[in-house]
Amino acid sequence: MDDLDAVVFQEKLGTTLAKSKRIVKLAGHLCESMGIDGQEKEDILRAAHLCKADLVTGAVVEFTSVQGVMGSYYAKAAGETDAVSQAIADHYRPRFSGDNPPATRVGKVVAVADKLDTICGLFAVDQAPTGSSDPFALRRSALGIVTMLCAGDDFEFDLVPAIDAVLAAYAADGIEFDAQAVREQVIEFFVTRTKVMERDNGVSADAIDAVLAAGVREPLEFAKRVIALEHARREDPDTFNDLAVAYGRANNLRDPELGVDYDDSLLCEVEHALTCAIVQAEGRVARALEANDYPEALAELASLRKPVDLFFERIMVMDEDAVLRENRLKVLNRFVNVFSSVADFGLLAK
């Protein structure tokens, strides 16, 4: 392994030995994030430690296309477990569009750690993709990470904290860069890759834009929200219609500049019923979002259709009395804010 200290990873980012140490560190972070322990964690950390060792062997120096594959053979011959040798072979995957991801969770963790280290490092030294130029295939690497993350199996973690962990490791290695700026660039890079993946999967552009407008940055959360919206539109039209109508009626009149602090003493019975429904929905939607149960969050929002319809049937929002008018608009502002925590429903076509 010490020979890797003579192998340059990238001119401004140091050696492959330093990269290997960061991969191990991030792999440990990912294990903690996903609750991986025991033998599986040991295999992950061992594979992370050894995954670049074959770069100094004659076979890989001569034929770079066999990197990882040769490392797997060497690891097996040295008595490493099957899980470790398989992960070493797989950690470059997916190598190209349509390629399969690593076959095991051990391999996926090492693959993500390697790819994320490369992406963050190159962004830190101003080597991000530009236009059609992507010499380090960072878009493919990011899409590989997002695809693994959103595959719906036992491989789920928050990406933003992992990005933070990588950037902290680079800073600890003495690499100088604007941490906050690079952080935002990398996060936005992954958001864009997630958008591309979902569009390729047939998700409507308006659903993607609606979720983005809610400030969602985590690829897994983003994917689950847009899928829930698309499912409601295609498979549960009644719920989707309730969402659209309830939001639309309130949004047409709301005045954000007034805020949401309405005066309870000015509410009549119908207004009070709506505000009670809003307060209940706020709590239920927040709990559903915390549990990543986005269909439930949409169902809770759709349940507001009845009380808001009754509100508009019985109440003249634009009352001549300015105090009553502004108070009712504040109620509608708060109503719309509940929806905005999930998506910007104003961007959704019916």
Model features per residue range: what roles?
Residues 1-350:
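Amphipathic alpha-helical "coupling" segments that flank catalytic cores
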